[in-house]
């Protein structure tokens, strides 16, 4: 399981903006676009013993709903499973895992910590 550069140009720009937000707030970017055959985690960040699994949603308009609305219950379940696989593979010494959603829209980044 290796990171890869997938997704659209807009999605990559959103991931760059979200990464910058986490760096500005004292996090280390551990991995971007970590993937396995069952899916991908956009961002994995660390601050101390806290590991953050972040889903990044980028929108240019609200025409199809807010970025936060795009993270469905099915997507949340899939991210939990992916996080488990990541933890089993990497065996980090993390005591706490948190799931965030980063919404990137109109040049701004809003992070919902502990989104689920």
List PLM regions with ranges.
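Acidic-basic catalytic patches of nuclease active cores, encompassing PD-(D/E)XK
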Residues: 1-32, 87
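A short, N-terminal amphipathic alpha-helix
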Residues: 81-88
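Conserved catalytic cores of phosphodiester-cleaving nucleases, focusing on short active-site segments
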Residues: 41-67, 71, 79
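Short acidic/glycine-enriched loop/turn segments that link adjacent beta-strands
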Residues: 36-39, 107
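Hydrophobic "anchor" residues on beta-strands that sit immediately upstream
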Residues: 28, 51, 96
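Residue-level signal for inorganic ion chemistry
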Residues: 22, 79, 99
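Domain-level recognition of nuclease-like catalytic cores that cleave nucleotide substrates
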Residues: 89-116
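Positively charged, solvent-exposed patches that mediate nucleic-acid binding
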Residues: 1, 24, 37, 46-47, ...
